[in-house]
């Protein structure tokens, strides 16, 4: 009984009739509901704008602060819109290369087929290598031709050597034929050397000459000059 009396003493009727705390709780709950409704309306308007494929800047430009969950949804929607724009840009038609189109047109131009003409006068050359028998026969013919040419040339040279003699002294054998007053290879080696130096005189004869005479010829230039002086002094001696 003492406890009940103490509780009743602490509890008053004014406190029971005081509804100020209830009013504040009701006001807070109603304000929370209003905020939730406003957020829902904002999200609904945002979803309507996203269905119209508005740019990402318009989607993110809305007044007021949004909670973390709504921001994640907005980021997902912005990524989706960017991907859709990039796909539409990639799938757009690119300009056609004019050079490629011209090449395709050239390839598509019809061409008349060439008429096949028969060649009657043309020779047919075989691409095969010649037979060994044919090659040996050709080689033998070439060798025979060379031998004939060499033999004929050698005979001519021998005849020329037999007939050739020095036009000054009459020598037929000499190590080298030289230029003379009658042309090339008309003098023997000794007479040709003296003719080149300007000392070929009628009194000069080499010792091997068949026309050599001791009284009127000599192979020494000094002796030749003496003989000439003697002819001038005594013309009857000649």
Swiss-Prot record:
GO terms for biological process: circadian rhythm; positive regulation of DNA-templated transcription; response to light stimulus. It is found in: Nucleus. It comes from the Eukaryota. GO terms for molecular function: DNA-binding transcription factor activity; sequence-specific DNA binding; zinc ion binding. Pfam families: GATA. A zinc finger (GATA-type) spans 160-214. One of its GO terms (cellular component) is nucleus. The keyword Nucleus applies. Keywords: Activator, DNA-binding, Metal-binding, Nucleus, Transcription, Transcription regulation, Zinc, Zinc-finger. Gene3D superfamilies: Erythroid Transcription Factor GATA-1, subunit A. SMART domains: ZnF_GATA. A motif (Nuclear localization signal) lies at residues 112-119. Residues 24-64 are annotated as: Disordered. Belongs to the type IV zinc-finger family. Class A subfamily. Transcriptional activator that specifically binds 5'-GATA-3' or 5'-GAT-3' motifs within gene promoters. May be involved in the regulation of some light-responsive genes. This is GATA transcription factor 7.
């Amino acid at each position: 009984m003492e406890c009940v009396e103490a509780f009743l003493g602490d509890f008053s009727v004014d406190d029971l009739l005081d509804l100020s705390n209830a009013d504040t709780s009701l006001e807070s709950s109603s304000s929370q509901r209003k905020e939730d409704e406003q957020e829902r309306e904002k999200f609904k308007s945002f979803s309507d704008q996203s269905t119209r494929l508005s740019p990402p800047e318009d989607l993110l430009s809305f007044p007021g602060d949004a909670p973390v969950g709504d921001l994640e949804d907005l980021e997902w929607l912005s990524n989706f819109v960017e991907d859709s724009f990039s796909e539409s840009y990639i799938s757009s038609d690119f300009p056609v290369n004019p050079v490629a189109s011209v090449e395709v047109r050239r390839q598509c131009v019809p061409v008349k087929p060439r008429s096949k003409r028969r060649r009657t006068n043309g020779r047919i050359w075989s691409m095969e290598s010649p037979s060994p028998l044919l090659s040996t026969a050709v080689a033998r013919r070439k060798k025979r031709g060379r031998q004939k040419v060499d033999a004929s040339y050698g005979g001519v040279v021998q005849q020329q050597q037999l007939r050739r003699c020095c036009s000054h002294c009459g020598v037929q054998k000499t190590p080298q034929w030289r230029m003379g007053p009658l042309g090339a290879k008309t003098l023997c080696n000794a007479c040709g050397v003296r003719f080149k130096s300007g000392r070929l005189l009628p009194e000069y004869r080499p010792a091997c000459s068949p026309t050599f005479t001791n009284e009127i010829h000599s192979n020494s230039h000094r002796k030749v000059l003496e003989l000439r002086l003697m002819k001038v002094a005594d013309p009857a001696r000649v």
